[in-house]
Design a protein with these regions (language model features):
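A generic secondary-structure signal
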Residues: 107-111, 178-179, 213
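Alpha-helical interaction elements in eukaryotic regulators
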Residues: 100, 104, 145, 152-155, ...
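Short beta-strand/turn micro-motifs composed of small residues
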Residues: 94, 163, 191-194
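Inter-motif core of Ras-like GTPase G domains
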Residues: 142-167, 173-189
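Short acidic, S/G/P-rich loop/turn micro-motifs used as interaction or catalytic elements
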Residues: 98-100, 165-170, 195-199
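C-terminal effector/interaction modules appended to NTPase cores
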Residues: 2-146, 150-157, 267-810
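Canonical P-loop GTPase G-domain recognition
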Residues: 181-189, 194-284, 288-293
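Conserved NTP-handling cores and scaffolds of large molecular machines
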Residues: 112, 163, 214, 218, ...
């Protein structure tokens, strides 16, 4: 019997097809090897090498990095307090008004029996301690003199912060610490006098209270008792041996704090003279052909640099004394004098004080006026206005009388939208009162009074408005801005196309193009701009000077053309600090700062308000404009400095190379200056676009499926046709455009991407570029000394009114 063949199952046409595994279509290892053909990626190769380091090699690398950091710290310590290095500069900060700094200084004087103690006319105490092989200079600014403290802290190596056993740190002490933190805090040591005189039970409680308050700002610091000479010796050792902090804006530039100050007038009738500042040079090398800056007074040139003998040497034996200055060639003006001239200025190589560009009128695209037109404009500006006024009328009263023949001038381009709207309302009231004035002309006897056009400025200078009412108006305006941001009412008596002639519509604020070089103001022809700012900064910072005074030398700097008002307002005990400028740092450009409003500041700060800036080593006043701190090419203008978020302040100012800390102060009516914001330098960029937004609003009159009739946005047919290309949006998220005008009273038909709600509002966004005003002023007056912080000069009634004004809007 034959064996039957084995049958196997054969799939039919209806076989189930399972889906293939979705592996993401990644290439296999073999496919990648075939494509690369043995080549290895550079990143992978370096990564393998890093991972293949042996344990001993990694340990050796860590030890080398640790040794390098330790050597850097030791090198900084060796650069202070030695024989050929400047003394360790210490600033005593009284954090409570009841602290007697004289007791602290007396204890430091007797810290070491072998120490040599000297004190100069500027109030700087010098201690030469052979035991530690260190020199220490101690300066104590007056309590309440904030500028003296900030200027001294700019060049300080260490702050000796004195706290009390009662309040530890008072309100003014907290204010000083906030300013010092914003400016750049050097190393700090906390001491307390009178701690050991407390009962033993109270010492533990007081110690906990002090440590808790200190740890809020300085978590790693502890306070030291300073009651005996032994305590003082430990404090001096702590001052000279602790790690120093880096403050880059100071360490990158040469700086001198005045040990001796003298002033010589150029001649008896001159308003300027030569200021001689003698002190230890710190930081970098100082060249006489560079410029120096005096905080609060501006930039100056130098005539020469002298090298007198060091009056506070560490080695007191004349035979063993070695002058580092003798390594260079110097000439002496007098053979019997110890003063040697290090360097004299070379007029051919000396840096110029020109901070602005002289614009060429023929280089601009606009037509420049002729000399006849300029002369005519000047005569028009000086022209007197003759009015008929009643007899006995003063100049002040005559300025308020409206002349029927006087033409109503247009609003200035620099005025804000709110000011222009207020002017339009006031104009209507003036027109109604003008008729009543003309009716009484025949009944009143008149005389002719000549009034200059600048009477308004005279009136403003003599005006003394109530500060509480100003604050109330600002609070109202800020609240309205928060509730209805950037919304502007369209004027009914002025065409919108002329009212918003400088504005433009943007399809997208983020992506729409905007040329930063178009329609620039005339002030932009006076400023400087770098092709590559970062590269210029790197070149200026890394530049080494072969000639000049070296850090650590005791020098006398002759500063030329210093105003006589400087020495007239100078008070002994206030520090005089000189900072050498890097190349290009005296040239004016557009400077941007990122600042944040202080949490305890309640009053609104409007854009274009006068503020006082402390930027690194500079101090000046300006009227900044605020804008949002965002990414992109365009940044929205802010009418007020917001609370809780960072904002960019833009001003015309001399160029500064970052990093530089920023302190912003606002002057009060009583001459005090309050800290309102802190921040840092952002950039120097004239091409940064700050766009102001104006939002026109309209309301639906009739609503269809996708179209609606909108009114109250415009009031004539021509304005609707003019703004027809601009996109519309609503508060509820609809988008649309103008289709056609209806009638002659401002109604228009608009089409949207969906049906509108009856309670919705139609908005149109318009933008114009904003520029800061040229209000830079390097001369800043020193504020009054605060005897008790936070009291001011207000009466109790004024305080009650101010509190009521704030409560209305909280």
């Amino acid at each position: 019997m034959a064996v039957e063949p084995q049958k196997s199952h054969r799939p039919g046409p209806l076989k189930q097809q399972n889906k293939a595994h979705k592996h993401g279509k990644h290439k296999s290892k073999g496919q990648l090897e075939r494509e690369t053909k043995g080549r290895v990626n550079v990143k992978v190769l370096s990564k393998k090498n890093r991972q293949s380091m042996k344990k001993a090699e990694r340990r050796n690398q860590a030890l080398q990095m640790r040794k390098q950091k330790r050597d850097e710290v030791l090198e900084k310590k060796r650069n202070r307090g030695g024989t050929n290095t400047p003394p360790h500069f210490v600033v005593v900060v009284s954090l409570d008004r009841n602290i007697d700094t004289k007791v602290l200084l007396d204890l430091l004087k007797v810290a070491d029996d072998s120490a040599v103690v000297k004190q100069n006319e500027q109030g700087i105490l010098h201690l030469s301690i052979p035991r530690f092989k260190q020199r220490v200079s101690i300066f104590t600014p007056e309590y309440g003199n904030l500028y003296a403290l900030l200027d001294a802290a700019k060049v300080a190596d260490t702050l000796l912060c004195a706290v009390s056993t009662d309040n530890v740190i008072d309100k003014y002490g907290e204010h000083c610490l906030s300013c010092l933190y914003g400016q750049g805090m050097p190393a700090a040591v906390f001491v307390c006098n009178g701690f050991k005189s407390l009962p033993m039970k109270k010492q533990a409680e007081t110690r906990k209270l002090m440590q808790r308050k200190i740890e809020k700002r300085f978590p790693a610091e502890k306070f030291h008792s300073l009651d005996t000479s032994q305590d003082a010796l430990l404090v001096v050792r702590q001052l000279t041996n602790q790690k120093l902090r880096n403050i880059q804006y100071r360490d990158l530039r040469p700086h001198v704090i005045g040990e001796e100050i003298s002033f010589e007038l150029d001649n008896t009738e001159s308003d300027t003279g030569t200021l001689k500042v003698t002190g230890y040079l710190r930081g970098k090398t100082l060249s006489v052909n560079r410029l120096v800056h005096i905080p609060g007074w501006g930039d100056f040139q130098m005539l020469q640099i002298d090298a007198p003998d060091d009056p506070y040497p560490l080695n007191l034996h004349p035979g063993k004394q070695h002058r580092k200055n003798q390594d260079v060639e110097m000439e002496s003006e007098d053979p019997h004098s110890d003063v040697r001239v290090l360097e004299r200025c070379d007029p051919g190589q000396q840096e110029s004080l020109d901070s602005e560009v002289l614009p060429d009128p023929m280089m601009g695209e606009q037509t420049w006026p002729t000399e006849e037109e300029l002369a005519e404009a000047e005569s028009e500006s000086r022209k007197k206005i003759v009015k008929r006024v009643p007899k006995g009328t003063s100049d002040y009263q005559a300025a308020w009388i409206i002349d029927s023949d006087e033409e109503e001038g247009g609003d200035s381009e620099e005025e804000s939208d709110e000011e222009m709207d207020a002017d339009m309302e006031a104009q209507e009231e003036d027109d109604s009162s003008e008729e009543d004035l003309n009716d009484d002309d025949d009944k009143t006897e008149y005389e002719t009074v000549t009034i200059a056009e600048d009477d308004a400025s005279k009136y403003d200078a003599a005006m003394d408005l109530d500060e509480d009412m100003q604050m109330l108006a600002k609070l109202k305006e800020e609240k309205q801005h928060v509730q209805f941001p950037d919304e502007v009412d369209t004027p009914a008596n002025v065409t919108a196309r002329s009212r918003f002639a400088r504005y433009r519509g943007l399809k997208s604020f983020r992506t729409s193009p905007w040329d930063p070089k178009e329609n620039l103001p005339s002030d932009y022809a006076r400023i400087f701009q770098f092709e590559n700012f970062k590269r210029t900064k790197k070149r200026c910072v890394e530049e080494d000077m072969d000639e000049g005074a070296m850090p650590g030398w005791y020098v006398t700097v002759h500063v030329a053309n210093v105003p006589k008002a400087f020495i007239e307002g100078y008070q002994p005990g206030s520090p005089v600090v000189l900072f050498g400028l890097l190349p290009h740092e005296h040239k004016v450009s557009i400077v941007h700062f990122v600042v944040k409003k202080c949490a305890d500041v309640e009053q609104p700060i409007r854009s274009k308000d006068r503020l006082i800036f402390h930027v690194g080593y500079r101090r000046f006043s300006a009227n900044p404009i605020f804008s949002q701190h965002t990414l992109g090419s365009k940044h929205k203008f802010e009418r007020f400095m917001p609370t809780g978020t960072a904002v960019v302040a833009t001003v015309y100012a001399p160029i500064l190379f970052p990093p530089s800390p920023v302190l912003v102060f606002q002057e009060t009516a009583y001459g005090e200056q309050s800290l309102v914001a802190t921040g840092t330098l952002l950039s120097v960029n004239p091409d940064r676009i700050v766009a102001k937004r104006a939002v026109l609003s309209g309301y639906p009159f009739k609503i269809n499926k996708r179209s609606a009739v909108i009114r109250y946005m415009f009031f004539n047919r021509e304005d609707i046709s003019w703004f027809k290309p601009v996109e519309l949006r609503t508060k509820w998220g609809r988008r649309g455009h103008i289709k056609e005008p209806l009638g002659t009273h401002g109604h228009m038909k608009c089409v949207f991407d969906g049906k509108m709600k009856s309670q919705d509002t139609v908005l149109m966004n318009l933008y114009k570029r904003m520029y800061p005003k040229w209000t830079y002023n390097p001369h800043v007056t020193t504020p009054t000394v605060v005897k008790e912080y936070g009291t001011g000069n207000m009466d109790s009634d004024d305080k009650a009114e101010e509190g009521a004004a704030f409560q209305m809007f909280q």
